[in-house]
């Protein structure tokens, strides 16, 4: 069970909209969390991750991507992906202005994909990435890989993937991750589908991995 040890406040400045989780005892680290294509920053998984991070002293901004700010429902359009990454850049800059230490980017599905693409374009935008349920390919279309940017990704990446995720098998993800020149690790969530349920991710192990990378 996660105990609430943070002050949670709505944030809406500079085109960034979401919620700030402010820990009682800040570690100096910051994190931006973003949602998948069919969700928003109120997704239970993001709220749980934000609270888990706050228990470790991490200041968290879970935010709506620009496509979700424009409309409450519906998937993102491919033509708007660059704008979504620009929104992520602004969110990272916002959290960086609030903390003295490293900043992590984390996202579920589409949010994770855009986070990784932004890190490939701007290596200094984050100290490490947590990509949850990375959408390696559309379901039943394993040849339509979303990995063009992987060879440019030098930021450490933690993939958190369910073993029943139809967007990527463990074998497919392992093969794809080999193209990433930076440090990477796959953390499996046994029995979980693409929409990983609450309480299934080993938060302590996940954040320990991110911290291990920045300490090395």
What positions do the PLM features span?
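Short beta-strand/loop motif that positions the catalytic acidic residue
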Residues: 153-154, 159-161, 165
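Short alpha-helix in the alpha/beta-hydrolase fold that links the catalytic acid
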Residues: 46, 143-146, 155, 169-177
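Primarily recognizes the serine-hydrolase "nucleophile elbow" in alpha/beta-hydrolase
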Residues: 88-152
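Catalytic histidine-centered segment of alpha/beta-hydrolase-like enzymes
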Residues: 192-203
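Serine-hydrolase catalytic machinery in alpha/beta-hydrolase-like enzymes
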Residues: 9-102
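Acidic catalytic loop of the alpha/beta-hydrolase fold
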Residues: 163-168, 195
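Glycine-rich His-Gly loop
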Residues: 33-37, 109, 162
């Amino acid at each position: 069970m996660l105990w609430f040890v943070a002050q949670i406040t709505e944030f809406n400045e500079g085109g960034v909209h979401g919620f700030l989780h402010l820990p009682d005892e800040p570690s100096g680290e910051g994190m931006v969390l973003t949602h998948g294509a069919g969700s928003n920053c109120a997704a239970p998984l993001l709220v749980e991750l934000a609270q888990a991070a706050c228990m470790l002293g991490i200041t968290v901004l879970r935010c709506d991507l620009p496509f979700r700010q424009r409309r409450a429902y519906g998937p993102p359009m491919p033509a708007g992906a660059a704008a979504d990454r620009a929104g992520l850049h602004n969110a990272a800059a916002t959290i960086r202005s609030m903390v003295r230490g490293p900043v992590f980017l984390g996202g579920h599905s589409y949010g994770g994909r855009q986070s990784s693409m932004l890190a490939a374009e701007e290596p200094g935008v984050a100290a490490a990435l947590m990509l949850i349920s990375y959408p390696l390919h559309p379901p039943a279309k394993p040849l339509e890989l979303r990995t063009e940017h992987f060879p440019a990704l030098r930021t450490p990446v933690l993939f958190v993937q369910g073993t029943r995720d139809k967007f990527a098998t463990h074998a497919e993800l392992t093969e794809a991750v080999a193209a990433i020149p930076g440090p990477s690790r796959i953390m499996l969530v046994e029995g979980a589908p693409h929409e990983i349920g609450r309480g299934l991710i080993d938060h302590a192990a996940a954040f320990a991995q991110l911290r291990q990378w920045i300490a090395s």
